[in-house]
Amino acid sequence: MNREQRRQAERIARRGARSTPQRESERNITHSLVAQALVRNRIMREVHSLRTNASLHAFTGNDASHIADRMGRLLYTVAYATTVHGLHRTPEANILRGTANALSDIAASPAALETQRAAILAGLSAIDRLMPSLHEFSLAAGALELDQILLAGNFTTDHVERMLQQRAAA
């Protein structure tokens, strides 16, 4: 590399290292309304996909472990957002607690699926009623916390009930 090429490379490196307010705002989604809208759209698309998957299996599925997994994921995410918004004392939050108990029963005994199906469907209805009151970023925070719990490898449906009880006691 000759001297001129080296100087040119140094100029390019310095130019790229400079941070302007415009470059910072382009990288930071909190200043970009378009980026925020895209993130919100993606979060809601994933939540609705999880909700659709859970409801299909709840209505027609016979695989108890799959129902418990999908519904448990959705339930925890919504329960987290519910507590963030202070809705943990609503009838819907009580239904979420009951659904968590039903999922716990299903996880322990897959034969209990048919007897607990009504509680799962009630939980889906409660989730539908809660969703308009929940912010997308609260749902995302719940999903991130769920991911941390899953990485630890000890997620049970009792996490939902404990979290709601914790917030109700506070």
Name each model feature, range by range.
Residues D69-G98, R129-L146, L150:
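Extended intrinsically disordered, low-complexity coil regions enriched in Ser, Thr, Gly, Ala
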